[in-house]
């Protein structure tokens, strides 16, 4: 005790004889401050340990009372060296903190003092209703409590406030109930007041209509509701009463409270904004009155707008509601006079369009259009759905795409001649213009440098007055002002002088097509000769000479080569810089390629892949007939596989090669006809348009963004462009089609596209900002909704009625009539051909059956094989079975077991030929010696593994036991004609080899990974909306955010591949008969190509093999390698293994030691928290019950709210509840139902259709079930199920799980080694190697974080690992340190009872580095940390981490030994 502290204790009369004195005397005063003016003292005390609460309160009271007696104030802070405390002490201090708040912050104290509090291990969790969390009141509360606790020494206590959902619900209900009761009370008081007035008033003379009855009042209320003024939602931003909205319900949720009341929460939009709405109803009977509140309905609502304290947003409490009719847009033209849309995008246009193809086709059909075209950007992924939808809707679908057309080779030199590059004279020039169109914009500067052998010999620089003020955009871009051009020479004079300046020279420009195009257009306009001398384009020169550079613009190139460019976009500076670059290029092209002649640049430098840098132009391609469909599939494939560069490109020569059966349209403003017309005029456009079958024109509104981009002056210019496009077509006698460039259905949907497109960011071309600085904004998007015929005619009314009708209706109908109906998706299954597949399957089946069951076969086996083979061979499925068998057999030969998934284990043929281990026959005994068998067919056993041990009645050999009693119908359907879906679980280590086996068996050109299409997910859509809100200064209420996110979700974002699915094309066809192909995620370096279509779209037409990677086979292989035990020899009914499911004794530990009451931690299928809970509730003892658990855990609404309750209430047992789908059919057949009906009931239940089928059908099944004594609880259970797990799948999983469990019980060190090597996802070596206490402490730490929802995904994975570490340590095994010379790269090493971790278990050390480190140590010892870094490939951080863990011992920093080291 310090002297000052001892003096203080004496002055406050702290009793020295009390126990408290012995505790407090370790204290000291660290510092003291006196604020004289305030007569206030502030102490900082220090104690070794946290004071007991009794001692603390005694000290606190004496301290304050002593200073109070002196008329002074005192405050203090306590620092504690050891701040550990038990729960009761923390609770006491927490109560003290609340008392402190009571006097200083009573409002917060009163708010929180009655909340639920959970205290444990330096952690305080407070449970609070949602509105407290939403108002952020808890943040202030936490800060205040934390301050008080910190001042008394508890600075390390974490405090969190979690939502008390039960309290939230109760408060919300109470709030509504109280509000209703207040309303009722007010109405009652009003009635009483009215009655009092009536009673005190003289009785009026009798009237003919004395009083209105209730019905009349009600009708008046309804009439007022019907006539009420409708308020747009966007106008309501505060609480208001009796507001009336009309809108569309886009989301509905109902929930029932504990008291039986029901709240209907729904969201309505009028497309100006959206509102959340609420309606409370007393019970389910009253709920019927509000049946109109369902998604998709239009309603009129009246109610009060209130700020809901629970959602913290404006919400309408609905008083009146009625369904209203909503008239969608209609096409008003008569039948036969309706247009065909030839340019429409669906949500498969990547991040660019909104409607599904179904919505597009439904709209066209509703309007009575005879056909509609699908033209997504560069893909045809909506074809299959469009094909099916069009057939259903009775409308012709025209299948097309908007392709990215590129030139095959872009020349470097135009008008090439035989000239030596070093000897030629060059005129390097640049022009500045008022815009990009040589037709609609004007020259304002021509500048040039005449150069010879790298020297400037003459210069040209003239401004040109366009005759009107320059736009701000032009001045900002070029730096040229009106003052520059004012008084300049006439244009003709400048052109003539420039032609004279260029005589005898080679012209040079960067992006020469623009500059030359502008010059030629002006030459032609003034009857001057166009450019005929050679022209070098330095942009293409750079692209071909330096293909490794990503950017070849003038700015990036001058920076790279150190060429001055002081004023980019002023012609004189640009021209001189381009000239300097030219001579660098001439020097480099000689040094790199030996080229010296101008002609060689085109013939020898332009590469075959110059299409990669070629400017993309859009063209619309349409399938005209079946040949065209296959050719489009080829073009899409080639564009994605052979010519992909940023986007899928189609070189012109490739389109020419596959043009048969395809109609080519000129597309949009990004098409080359439109671009040529805009840039070079009608004559040039006519030349370009010759390539196309028809010319597209679009409504002026579609071209409007070009005005914002300064490419077109105004709307009048747009109309003239459209007339010019029609003139181009007329000169060539080609039809003109008016198309809408559709990107969404209705005008109000434009916001969805706006959000999606802006989410691409400013790097996307469509979002390139116009202007600079704060004013920079992307160009507006066009009005691209699906237009009706009359709307389209209105758009083109400026052309005159007849011409508008011709291009909108007549020509589109005529073109649609030229297009034939095609078959996009085939009707039948086309399996590959394998010689003698049917014979091989049959032979292998019978051979194995004879080997196991003898010859002749038992009738039950013979009949099952005959039944199955009849379906398999008769429907052409033999090749699917044989292919699967070959794959499984190859993996087996490599030493891996293969697990089956799905229902393939329902097929006995699959068992016999080795596809699956699951035997679907009824439970039976089988003699391994004499093949005698006994079958149990009365349903008394659910699995043959549960039969009691028995000796063969014929030869006395112990029987083997097998059979899971699974009907074949669950695999191929009742009639055996359902396409088999064989899913197989290969070892993750062997999966790549299994994939390659498919290629080897069927051929690389016939095997493709199953493609997938990734779309914008709900959460991502929400993020896009919030991002748009932020970036564009919008504000949306929550309901509107939800509405916008729903509109945005589902748009294509990327492509991918199924993790194990491989599609096999029959070898007598090619892939383009079914689908285009591509690379996953546009990764042209991927090893496999994928189907372009989502594989689900063609899975009934081609063979799909699911070759999945799984840990179980890998783990089994590891255990076999460690132990030498063949996993196939492990019994499925090992009694010690079964004990794992009822306790922990078999592991030699107590439940308290490992934190769970069973031994299933780390056992596949049973080790998750959810399934462990099921195991603890049910304590299964048989294999059949484990199958039940597997089915129950994988199903939906099979366990929770169903089987769990039946078992708890004693109505059924684990054995008798519905667990797997097949159990229904088997149980019902044993009960006496017809097999066909039993199968149908099973199918209805497993797909969640029981309550969706007609009441008549369902009642028929129920009657049959009751007639056969099926209990009511069983029937009710069927009605709750949404999805069921196949028994065969469960059996395969459980068999694998029990093999792993066998090693856990009987060979634990092998088990733990395999588990950590293969299954563990996260490691923390410092903790794992530090012993039990450290492991348990870290687990507690993560538990606390989980309670506060603060645990990271990594920590959650780590917790799972630590559970197994803890169990291993409790069983007497140890976890060793990393060892630089023992640890392996990726797998744990066994040393006696100790596991040595591998290098990859160290955080931040990857597999490749781990392998490099192991290889390096084989070469010799590491003599220093420097050597370890260099040879081992370790970073400095990793070396430091190893050193901190003590793994490097005394390893020196480098190899240079001190001269004196040897003396010591």
Swiss-Prot record:
Pfam families attached to this UniProt entry: DNA_pol3_a_NI, DNA_pol3_a_NII, DNA_pol3_alpha, DNA_pol3_finger, HHH_6, PHP, RNase_T
SUPFAM superfamilies attached to this UniProt entry: Nucleic acid-binding proteins (SSF50249), Ribonuclease H-like (SSF53098)
Catalysed transformations (reactions): DNA(n) + a 2'-deoxyribonucleoside 5'-triphosphate = DNA(n+1) + diphosphate
Major localization listed first in the record, in broad terms: cytoplasm
One cellular-component annotation, GO: cytoplasm
Domain Exonuclease per the UniProt entry, residue ranges: 426-582
Top EC class for this record: transferase
GO function term, MF aspect, one: DNA-directed DNA polymerase activity
EC number: 2.7.7.7
Subcellular compartments: Cytoplasm
InterPro entries per the UniProt record, alphabetical: DNA_pol3_alpha_NTPase_dom (IPR011708), DNA_pol3_finger (IPR040982), DNA_PolC-like_N_II (IPR024754), DNA_PolC-type_N_I (IPR028112), DnaE2/DnaE/PolC (IPR004805), DNAPol_HHH (IPR029460), DnaQ (IPR006054), Exonuclease_RNaseT/DNA_pol3 (IPR013520)
Keyword tags: Cytoplasm, DNA replication, DNA-directed DNA polymerase, Exonuclease, Hydrolase, Nuclease, Nucleotidyltransferase, Transferase
SMART domains attached to this UniProt entry: EXOIII, POLIIIAc
Gene Ontology terms: biological process: DNA-templated DNA replication
Family according to the record: Belongs to the DNA polymerase type-C family. PolC subfamily.
Xref: PANTHER family: DNA POLYMERASE III POLC-TYPE, DNA POLYMERASE III SUBUNIT ALPHA
Protein task: Required for replicative DNA synthesis. This DNA polymerase also exhibits 3' to 5' exonuclease activity.
Protein name (record): DNA polymerase III PolC-type
Native source species: Streptococcus thermophilus (strain ATCC BAA-250 / LMG 18311)
Gene that encodes it: polC
């Amino acid at each position: 005790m310090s002297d000052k502290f001892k003096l203080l204790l004496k002055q406050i009369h702290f009793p020295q004889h009390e126990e408290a004195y012995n505790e407090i005397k370790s204290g000291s005063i660290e510092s003291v401050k006196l604020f004289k003016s305030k007569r206030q003292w502030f102490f900082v005390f220090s104690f070794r340990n946290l004071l007991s609460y009794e001692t603390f309160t005694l000290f606190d009271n004496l301290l304050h009372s002593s200073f109070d007696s002196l008329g002074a104030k005192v405050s203090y802070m306590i620092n504690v060296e050891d701040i550990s405390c038990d729960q009761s002490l923390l609770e006491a201090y927490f109560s003290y903190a609340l008392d402190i708040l009571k006097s200083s912050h009573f409002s917060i104290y009163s708010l929180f003092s009655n909340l639920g509090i959970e205290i444990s291990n330096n952690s305080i969790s407070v449970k609070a209703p949602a509105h407290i969390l939403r108002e952020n009141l808890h943040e202030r509360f936490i800060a205040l409590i934390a301050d008080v606790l910190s001042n008394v020494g508890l600075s390390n206590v974490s405090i969190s406030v979690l939502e008390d959902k039960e309290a939230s619900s109760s408060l919300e209900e109470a709030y509504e109930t109280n509000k209703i009761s207040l309303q009722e009370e007010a109405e009652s008081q009003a009635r009483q007041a009215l009655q009092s007035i009536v009673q005190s008033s003289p009785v009026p003379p009798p009237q003919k209509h004395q009083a209105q009855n209730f019905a009349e009042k009600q009708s008046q209320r309804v009439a007022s509701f019907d006539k009420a003024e409708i308020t747009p939602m966007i106008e309501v931003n505060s609480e208001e009463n009796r507001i009336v909205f009309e809108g569309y319900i886009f989301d509905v949720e109902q929930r029932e409270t504990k008291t039986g009341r029901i709240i209907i929460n729904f969201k309505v939009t009028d497309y100006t904004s959206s509102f959340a709405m609420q309606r409370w109803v007393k019970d389910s009977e009253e709920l019927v009155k509000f049946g109109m509140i369902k998604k998709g309905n239009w309603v009129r609502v009246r109610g009060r707008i209130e700020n809901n304290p629970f959602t913290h947003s404006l919400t309408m409490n609905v008083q009146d509601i009625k369904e209203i009719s909503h008239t969608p847009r209609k096409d008003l033209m008569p039948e036969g006079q309706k247009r065909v849309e030839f340019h429409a995008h669906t949500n498969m246009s990547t991040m660019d369009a909104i409607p599904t193809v179904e919505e597009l086709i439904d709209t066209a059909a509703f309007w009575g259009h005879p056909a509609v075209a699908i033209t997504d950007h560069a893909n045809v992924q909506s074809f299959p759905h469009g094909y099916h939808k069009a057939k259903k809707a009775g409308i012709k679908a025209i299948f097309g795409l908007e392709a990215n057309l590129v030139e095959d080779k872009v020349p470097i030199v135009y008008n090439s001649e035989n000239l030596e590059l070093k000897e030629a004279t060059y005129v390097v020039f640049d022009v500045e213009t008022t815009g990009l169109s040589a037709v609609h914009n004007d020259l304002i500067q021509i500048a040039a440098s005449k150069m010879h052998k790298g020297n400037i010999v003459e210069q040209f620089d003239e401004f040109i007055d366009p005759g009107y003020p320059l736009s701000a955009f032009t001045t900002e871009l070029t730096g040229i002002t009106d003052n520059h051009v004012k008084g300049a020479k006439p244009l003709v004079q400048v052109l003539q002088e420039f032609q004279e300046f260029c005589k005898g020279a080679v012209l040079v420009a960067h992006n020469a097509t623009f500059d030359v195009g502008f010059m030629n257009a002006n030459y032609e306009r003034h009857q001057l000769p166009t450019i005929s001398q050679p022209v070098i384009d330095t942009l293409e020169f750079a692209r071909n000479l330096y293909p490794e550079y990503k950017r070849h613009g003038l700015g990036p190139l001058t920076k790279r080569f150190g060429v001055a460019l002081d004023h980019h976009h002023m012609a004189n500076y640009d021209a001189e810089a381009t000239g300097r670059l030219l001579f660098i290029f001439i020097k480099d092209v000689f040094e790199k390629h030996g080229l010296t002649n101008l002609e060689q640049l085109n013939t020898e430098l332009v590469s075959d892949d110059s299409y990669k840098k070629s400017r993309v132009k859009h063209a619309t391609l349409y399938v005209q007939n079946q040949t065209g469909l296959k050719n489009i599939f080829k073009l899409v494939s080639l564009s994605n596989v052979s010519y992909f560069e940023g986007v899928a490109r189609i070189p012109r020569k490739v389109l020419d090669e596959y043009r048969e059966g395809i109609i080519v349209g000129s597309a949009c403003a990004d098409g080359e006809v439109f671009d040529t017309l805009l840039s070079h005029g009608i004559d040039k456009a006519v030349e370009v348009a010759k390539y196309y079958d028809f010319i597209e024109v679009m409504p002026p509104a579609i071209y409007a963004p070009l005005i914002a981009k300064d490419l077109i002056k105004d709307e009048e210019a747009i109309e003239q462009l459209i007339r010019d496009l029609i003139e181009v077509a007329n000169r060539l006698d080609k039809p003109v089609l008016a198309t809408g460039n559709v990107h969404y259905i209705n005008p109000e949907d434009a916001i969805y596209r706006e959000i999606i497109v802006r989410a691409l960011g400013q790097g996307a071309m469509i979002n390139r900002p116009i202007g600079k600085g704060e004013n920079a904004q992307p160009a507006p998007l066009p009005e691209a909704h699906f237009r009706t015929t009359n709307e389209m005619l209105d758009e083109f009314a400026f052309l005159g009625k007849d011409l508008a009708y011709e291009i909108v209706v007549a020509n589109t109908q005529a073109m649609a009539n030229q297009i034939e109906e095609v078959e996009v998706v085939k009707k039948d299954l086309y399996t590959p051909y394998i010689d003698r597949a049917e014979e091989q399957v049959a032979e292998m089946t019978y051979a194995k059956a004879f080997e196991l069951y003898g010859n002749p076969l038992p009738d039950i086996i013979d009949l099952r094989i005959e039944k199955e083979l009849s379906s398999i061979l008769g429907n052409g499925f033999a090749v699917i079975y044989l292919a699967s068998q070959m794959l499984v057999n190859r993996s087996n030969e490599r030493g891996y077991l293969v697990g089956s998934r799905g229902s393939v284990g329902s097929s006995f043929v699959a068992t016999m030929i080795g596809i699956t281990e699951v035997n679907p026959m009824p439970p039976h005994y089988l003699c391994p010696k004499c093949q005698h068998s006994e079958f149990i067919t009365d349903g008394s056993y659910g699995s043959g593994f549960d039969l009691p041990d028995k000796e063969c009645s014929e030869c006395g050999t112990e029987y083997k036991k097998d059979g899971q009693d699974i009907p074949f119908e669950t695999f191929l359907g009742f009639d055996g004609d359902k396409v088999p879906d064989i899913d197989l679980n290969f070892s993750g280590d062997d999966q790549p080899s299994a994939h390659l086996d498919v290629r080897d068996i069927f051929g690389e050109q016939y095997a493709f990974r199953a493609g997938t299409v990734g779309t914008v997910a709900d959460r991502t859509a929400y993020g896009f909306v919030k991002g748009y809100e932020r970036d564009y200064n919008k504000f949306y209420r929550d309901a509107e955010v939800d509405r916008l996110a729903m509109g945005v979700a589902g748009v294509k974002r990327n492509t991918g591949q199924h993790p194990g699915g491989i599609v096999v094309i029959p070898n007598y066809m090619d892939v383009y008969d079914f689908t285009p192909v591509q690379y996953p995620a546009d990764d042209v370096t991927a090893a496999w190509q994928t189907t372009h279509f989502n594989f689900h779209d063609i899975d009934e037409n081609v063979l799909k093999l699911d070759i999945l990677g799984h840990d179980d086979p890998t783990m089994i292989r590891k255990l076999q390698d460690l132990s030498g035990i063949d996993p196939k020899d492990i019994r499925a009914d090992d009694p010690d293994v079964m004990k794992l499911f009822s306790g922990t004794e078999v592991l030699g530990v107590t439940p308290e030691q490992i934190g769970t009451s069973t031994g299933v931690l780390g056992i596949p299928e049973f080790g998750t928290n959810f399934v462990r809970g099921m195991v603890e509730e049910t304590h299964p003892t048989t294999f059949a019950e484990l199958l039940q658990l597997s089915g129950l855990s994988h199903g939906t609404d099979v366990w929770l709210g169903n089987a769990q309750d039946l078992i708890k209430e004693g109505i059924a047992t684990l054995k008798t509840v519905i667990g797997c789908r097949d159990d229904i059919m088997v149980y019902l057949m044993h009960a006496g139902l017809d097999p066909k009906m039993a199968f149908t009931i099973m199918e209805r239940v497993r797909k969640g259709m029981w309550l969706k089928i007609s009441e008549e059908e369902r009642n028929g099944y129920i009657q049959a079930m009751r007639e056969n004594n099926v209990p009511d609880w069983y029937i009710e259970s069927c009605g709750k199920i949404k999805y069921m797990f196949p028994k065969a799948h469960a059996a395969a999983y459980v068999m694998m799980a029990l093999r792993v469990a066998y090693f856990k019980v009987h060979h634990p060190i092998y088990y733990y080694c395999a588990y950590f090597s293969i299954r563990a996802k996260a490691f923390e070596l410092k903790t794992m190697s530090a012993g039990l206490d450290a492991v348990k402490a870290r687990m507690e730490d993560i538990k606390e974080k989980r309670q506060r929802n603060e645990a990271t995904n990594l920590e959650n994975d780590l917790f799972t690992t630590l559970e197994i570490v803890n169990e291993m340590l409790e069983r007497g095994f140890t976890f060793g340190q990393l060892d630089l010379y023992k640890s392996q790269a990726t797998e744990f090493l066994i040393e006696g009872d100790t596991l040595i971790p591998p290098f990859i278990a160290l955080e931040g050390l990857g597999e490749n580095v781990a392998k490099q480190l192991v290889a390096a140590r084989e070469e010799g010892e590491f003599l220093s940390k420097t050597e370890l870094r260099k040879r081992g490939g370790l970073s400095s951080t990793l070396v430091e981490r190893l050193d901190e863990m003590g793994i490097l011992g005394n390893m020196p920093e480098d190899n240079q030994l001190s001269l004196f080291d040897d003396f010591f």
